[in-house]
Amino acid sequence: MKSKWLILFIVFGLILTACGGGSDDAAEEEVVAEEPAEELDSPATTAAAAEPVADPPSICLVLDIGGLGDLSFNDLAYSGYQKAIEDFGMVGTFLEPDGGGENRGELLELCAEAGNDLIVGNGFLFDGAMNEVAPSYPDINFAITDGVAEPGNVRGMLFKHAEGSFLAGVAAALKTTTNNVGFIGGVDFPLIHEFEQGYLAGVAAINPDITVQIGYASVPPDFSGFNDPVKGKEIALAQYEAGADIIYHAAGGTGTGMFEAAKEVSEATGTKVWGCLLYTSDAADDYIR
């Protein structure tokens, strides 16, 4: 039993590292290739590793808006989830929400009723659902990324987004040939402002005369800006048209539209433009850095 809880403790660290805030040392994260998602009414269970632990701990990861394939925070959390299963022989289940995430609480309850030892809600939008569901399951550990919740059995995982974004800004300032770069945020609210401000500071640290274009896909209470590739492409094309040659995003699945725009502009003009993502991916080949 002690080994079971030790593994759970280590898994918290894996998830923290995967989401970019586990330590002060820079680390490269690799987004896992897209795989088919499970149906909500019959979640799949991943087999334990080759050397299973007696009474292996179980983890349930509930993704948020955009789900797998967003090339952003959902894919990154999923990579940490897979590593926990592979390295520690855990039994794992992952679920994806409805389009707007309205069923977050239902999915958390589904994980709890299945008896999972650790349940992770991926994103600050789980705070309300955590407050409602977690008190009914005091013996189960819950965690929420980028947020906090009141119940004593819920742990919030908060990160220094501005620091990583500062480095992205430095890189953009060093790479640009037009002295014009862009930023796309998913939703115009404080959490994403951390990414924006870090990026702006990084650019200014290299060259304060560089123009930085700012665009957001939506404003609260509309959180669709985290999964609107069409809007992301529209904003990116406008920024490229206005002279940007590098764009950095913190917009979840909306950012995939930015990658499409980068590819289109590069192929149409013969001039290389870049779409930049905080988390590494090869999904758009040379158009992501």
Label each region the model flagged.
Residues 20-28:
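Bacterial lipoprotein signal-peptidase II cleavage site
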Residues 59-85, 93-104, 124, 188-193:
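Extracytoplasmic "Venus flytrap"
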Residues 81, 166-214:
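An alpha-beta-alpha
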Residues 135-159, 281:
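Flexible loop/hinge segments that line or gate small-molecule binding clefts
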Residues 157-179, 232, 289:
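Hydrophobic alpha-helical segments within soluble ligand-binding/sensing domains
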Residues 198-243:
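Extracellular/periplasmic Venus flytrap/periplasmic-binding protein
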Residues 279-288:
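Single conserved hydrophobic/aromatic residue that forms the stacking wall/gate
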